[in-house]
Amino acid sequence: MSTSERGKRDTATHPVDEVLPPARLTVLGLQHLFIMYAGAIAVPFVVGGALKLSAATIALLVNADLLVAGIATLIQAVGVGKLFGVRLPVVAGATFTVIPPMITIAAKFGGEKGLPYVYGAMLCSGVFGLLIAKPFAKVIRFFPPLVAGIVITVIGLSLIGPAAAMIAGHDTEDPHYGQVSHIMVAFAVVFGILLLARTLRGFLGQIAPLLAIIAGSVLALFTHSWSGGARTGSWDLSGVGHADWLGFAAPFHFGAPRFDAAAIISLCIVMLVTYTESTADMIAVAEMTGKELSSADITRGLAADGLSALLGGSMNSFPDTLFAENVGLVQMTGVRSRWVTAVTGGLLVVMGVVPKVGAFVAAVPEFVVGGAALVMFATVTAVGIQTLKKTEFHGNHNLLIVATSLGLSLLPAYASDRFGNSVFFEKFPDWAQIVFGSPITIAVVAAFTLNLVFNHLGGGVGSPALPVVPAVPAVPAIAVVSARPAPGSGAASAPALQRSPAASPLP
């Protein structure tokens, strides 16, 4: 190999860092936005409804939520020096883990009057998160393909239920639950993605989910569904007319932050759970994109989560985590450029300060997006299974580790009430419900612990523990992208990456 060829190979831009043409960046960024929007605004709606806040106050929370999510996404995708941002194609949004403690804290101090205590605790949890980001990131040393595969698989499986709720409805006792028209449109979106994946090439193949959502939205116009609003019924653009052009609330809108020890402890536990989920998502994206992930990368990504809690506490919002919905989209489309999700972050910021834009996106029927979400969540599961294939299952206890971890982690997902909320640990203390109510957290704890016990302590043999995620080419789980991606698509095969010197197995 000539010196010039070797130089070109060494200086080649990794697909994660590739800057695509502006038009493609915009469309691909919009696709990520459509996928995550329903989840992004769910937290303020649920919290606002539980606390019986006024419509105007809930709208303020939604705007603040989108603004902070946009800032957090920009920080994660673009990065801020050596301090913040994992620099991967990820999207941040409000974590669902914060809902129970946030409602409990606010209700304890008088509903809306208790929000200053919520935001005071959130500020403290953000500081706590920044302090523990570096030591927490060291756990990546104990995430071999065995553990990573289990966690990624659980991420996907635990999201199938929410996808079903998006399609059929969120209350099984509602007379409108499971409408045939909604389910058929969602299936049409799934079929559309498969059809477009089979027939389209290049850029059009990469935006197959977005094209299917658009087609499904048009189809929804002709369904005879009940007029129940954009989130559960068919198209309803009335919210666009009522939305303001500008809607930016001043920091500490609900008053100066106040501090309560129990509230602070609760949200610090939420931060630990958030870090667990974000770490799993970062590992999954690194696996999909072929980008080597070091503990320093994880530290910056977690620090960005901690910073989002500080921003949320001061700007009337919520702590953010990385959205698994968008992790699945990265794998499904094969587009690995982090600048795509940077555009998504910019769009979220715009929606946070221009409510009319957000209201229009919110008008897309939820069952339409649910069809696309179903494929993407299942894709995450497929990536986890693909990762587990790298594990040796003969002459060790790895199969038992996988079986036990999957069984334990899915218990909360399969034991739920009429609204889909897990009730398996409802008799446990509040802190235990927060920690163990997340299948992802249980998966991480179980797989991590069992791997150490069976494969490392006492001379166990099995799966080697690696300090970084192995850099492998990202092969789409479903053929949305052609085997010959279009130039500048960001879907080129990842170059071979050298493992860092620190990447040695545990003794």
Feature-to-residue mapping (PLM):
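N-terminal signal-anchor module of multipass membrane proteins
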Residues: 2-89, 100-109
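Juxtamembrane interface elements at the cytosolic ends of transmembrane helices
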Residues: 6-10, 40-44, 48, 188-199, ...
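Hydrophobic transmembrane alpha-helices of multi-pass solute/ion transporters
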Residues: 10-11, 15-19, 195, 210-267, ...
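Hydrophobic, membrane-embedded alpha-helices of multi-pass small-molecule transporters
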Residues: 23-40, 178-190, 208, 248-281, ...
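Short, non-helical or kinked segments that cap or interrupt transmembrane helices
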Residues: 60, 83-97, 141-148, 205-211, ...
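Membrane-embedded alpha-helical modules
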Residues: 107-226, 344-345, 349-463
